[in-house]
Swiss-Prot record:
CDD domains: GH55_beta13glucanase-like
One Pfam family in the UniProt entry: Pect-lyase_RHGA_epim
First-listed, main subcellular location of the protein, grouped into a coarse class: secreted
Name of the protein: Probable glucan endo-1,3-beta-glucosidase ARB_02077
Intracellular or extracellular location(s): Secreted
UniProt-listed Enzyme Commission number(s): 3.2.1.39
Amino acid sequence: MARGLVSSLLLGQLLLVLVGLFSPAGAVPTPQYQTPNTQASSYWLSSIKRQGIAPFNGGGAGYKVFRNVKDFGAKGDGSSDDTAAINMAISSGSRCGKGCDSSTTTPALVYFPPGTYVVSKPIIQYYYTQIVGDALNMPVIKAAPSFEGIAVIDSDPYENDGSNWYTNQNNFFRGIRNLVIDLTGLDKSKGACIHWQVAQASSLQNIRFEMVKGGGDANKQIGIFMDNGSGGFMTDLVFNGGNYGAFFGNQQFTTRNLTFNNCNTAIFMNWNWAWTFKSLSVNDCGVALNMSNGGFNQTVGSVMILDSKIKNTPKGVVTSFNAESVPESGGTLILDNVDFTGSTDAVTSLQGSSIVGGGSVIKHWVQGNAWTAGSGSKAKRLPPQVQAKPDVARRDDCPAPAPQPPAQSTAPPYPIPETGEPTRVPTTEPSNVPTRVPTGGVPSGTTGTAPSTPSPSPTGGPTACPSAPVTKARVQTALPQPSKPAILLDKSGKVFERAKPQYENVSADKFLSVKSAGAKGDGKTDDTKAIQAVLDKATADQIVYFDHGAYLITSTIKVPKNIKITGEIWPMLMATGKAFSDMKNPIPMLQVGQPGDKGNVELSELIVTTQGSAPGCILVEWNVAEETQGSVGMWDVHFRVGGFAGTQLQSNTCAKTPNTTTTPDPKCFGAFMLLHITKTASAYLENTWLWVSDHELDLADHGQINIYNGRGALIESSGAVWMYGTASEHNTLYNYQIQNAKNVYMALIQTETPYYQSNPDALVPFAPDTKYNDPTFGDCTTAACKKAWGLRILNSTDVFLFGGGLYSFFENYKQECLKTESCQLNMIEVLCSETYLYGVSTKASTNMITSGGKGLVPQKENRSNFCSTIALFHQGNL
């Protein structure tokens, strides 16, 4: 949710993009797909009994959580203008629109039956909205020839003064899936399918973007236009045609299984801090990914491309990274198992020269600062670069700007930017001016184990292993590919992945509603027994369904080892009561399987949280191991503690206290731990956000708050753990801890240190517990040392991280520490472990990585556009 620096160069690129979105219409091409029929669907979501309520809404039983757009007058006949009806379906019920910023009390699940829905203005997706099409017969949303607006679906509208409805990096809890969005009725000179300016707990899934094919530079159509935000996850998307399949800019993001066909440029990366692409497929495009924005002064922090294939596309990746580019670690690029046999050049400079030729599979290629035991002897080095110190980044700044106030026009009130020349406009076809690429080894960086400030050795974990020294090299080279354990790989040799289940072929009568079984979900009634009864009686062919509501749980729910559970737009499971009050004897709210179990567990579309203080609660204890690969997992399940209605942990009770020496109020304690993946378990996690709230979502002040939550995610599994698009924020002792584990794959992770630390520090109010191998901070001598670890890896093997953003923005809500990038001392601990960490970005931590009590990787030698970034950390030889 952080923000960074404003760049006029980025602004110029955004202005040109927006001009394209609002260009006048011209000749209309014919559609490029078959129009779906409008018959009734057998998809369960369209016919299941609707009993969901918004328990903290205050509007009573009349508030509708589920909305079918046809109930609001939409025709879906391919000719009627359905704009007003669709927007009414979304907005009705005094929901969170312009001027609201955020609210959890007005959720809406908006369903599109099969059909073709013509729109002439943007569909505005209000906060806490899921737009869901029929999964069996995907509906089409088609832009009329007269369409005017920023995009067919707009997640964060702009006003004429350039302001947004929602704060981009706090634009949480929204999703779109199962749609075809069609721009082929527009002239090729304008149009975007989705304006996706979002933050955590957001997703796009199973969407096809239809745009005009060909047209050269005159084609300005875009599938996804993303200007900024703090995401996020998207998966299973297909982009056909257009200029840019996707125009991306965000702090951090994870994408999986994106396919681009016949785009001028598949992906234009405008800016980021960290972005992971898994399973890209690019076919018949001009450029697969252009990350060269900014030229010499790079705007892209880091990109990971994994298990991907580029076919019949001349240019794979266009980069501006070279011997002279700044910042030093800007433009970090990792290629891991990427098939460029269909490309002339795999990696190309902005000026057009080939860096890596195409025609083969690149097993492993690294661009950026590598810290390894073998860097000095094996890596092709580039010299380090020195740049002027940038302006101090502030929390209330943003690294990718909104467009400037637009000029008045005859179009609806969406921004049409004033014309203006940007500093530099990236092109899809770089010029032929050669770039200087060094041919010899040039010394860069340092070798050793001690930066300016030593870090303490952990006393809650193993200390016998000596700290292996690492050497820094600024590289642009192929490296040996680390061997990944077979347990993590699918049959084709790629890292395993699995889409969120939608149960398309399950009939509605196979869903067991917890409300029909007696649970109330009203945020007042103890629903423990009713929920347990439903779980106990569910059979293998049934799915337990949580209608939207707030379900109070007062003792441990035992989740069987073979079960499927899904919810209606994130129903809340809330731990409360005396059973969860003892932090010295914590118990789980949801105990998923028993130690030693093997089975098939699927959890999706849920919120797990507390009502009031629950310092003796582990929200989810995950014990079950997979029976078949990936058969146990969580998709779109979010851990959200405090900061919203019904939690009793809000800004009116737990406001921040930076001006006094703080003794934590027991009424503002959260949970003992959010997620524990135990020793015998395995798990597949996708789009899972573990968030201890830093600010209020529902009360009008949206003020910052102090919620004290002991620990984030503890992973001890010796099975397989996959984590795609996960984040863990604002936990007191640590956000992620991996100990005595193996076979852990993370792509990507994001963390934030609690804003209130070090008032109090990490040792308050949750004392380190030896049973859980907590950090003790016993050797710390400064306040900056006693802050939450972003990630600890202890006594573990085969741990892979492809992309990480681990941030520290405050010292007791003040930001003077950003001037020296020293808000805390240490962020990542690696001890007695075999790890491969790629694309790691940290903010304002003096030491990025420590081991055995010594700082190995200092942030000051790895400056990027906003964070400090390294391409690779590995303590062994490559």
